[in-house]
Amino acid sequence: MARYLGPKLKLSRREGTDLFLKSGVRAIDTKCKIDTAPGQHGARKPRLSDYGSQLREKQKVRRIYGILERQFRNYYKEANRLKGNTGENLLVLLEGRLDNVVYRMGFAATRAEARQLVSHKAIVVNGRVVNIPSFQVSVNDVVAVREKSKKQARIKASLELAEQRERPTWLEVEAAKMEGVFKRVPERSDLSADINEHLIVELYSK
């Protein structure tokens, strides 16, 4: 599947917030002007219409999880089909992606790096190699680094970096073993308050 390969910080500047596309070793505002959009007229902040705000929110979430438009729309359709709040369902589906779980557990410094680990067969789920980044992790699934991949310096560095941030409460991680358990489905209160999923629902409901 095609992926965006351009400058990562430019995307964060476009959305005006940290999309966590970089490792987090340094605060993003020390690397770039996060409150200034890229381009010659980046300092100007145009007033957005309702549609513009909805579109920006969708783009922001899509870029956070590194998903292209067609796949994101499919996630929305599935979220809308499920019982409950469509917006919350959407976020739960995105959080349940294997590449995201690998990132959340601290085995990778970014979601892009996590996606690469999965694609390169460095991750096992319940003892079996899974190389599909979009694989949906279920409750009680055990996600671990493959034995022959445990010596990778980047994985060790990512785990050290993960110690500096709070791990999600719906995951249980044993860093020494390089494995973790998807204990429960995250609730909305567990997830970022910086995301307004209602705008995305409004956009796709038109």
UniProtKB/Swiss-Prot annotation:
Gene3D superfamilies associated with the record: Ribosomal Protein S4 Delta 41, Chain A, domain 1, RNA-binding S4 domain
Cellular component terms (Gene Ontology): small ribosomal subunit
SUPFAM superfamilies: Alpha-L RNA-binding motif
S4 RNA-binding domain residues: 96-156
MF-aspect GO terms: rRNA binding; structural constituent of ribosome
Keywords: Ribonucleoprotein, Ribosomal protein, RNA-binding, rRNA-binding
Taxonomic superkingdom: Bacteria
One BP annotation, GO: ribosomal small subunit biogenesis
Family under the similarity heading: Belongs to the universal ribosomal protein uS4 family.
Function summary: One of the primary rRNA binding proteins, it binds directly to 16S rRNA where it nucleates assembly of the body of the 30S subunit.
Subunit architecture: Part of the 30S ribosomal subunit. Contacts protein S5. The interaction surface between S4 and S5 is involved in control of translational fidelity.
Name of the protein this chain belongs to: Small ribosomal subunit protein uS4
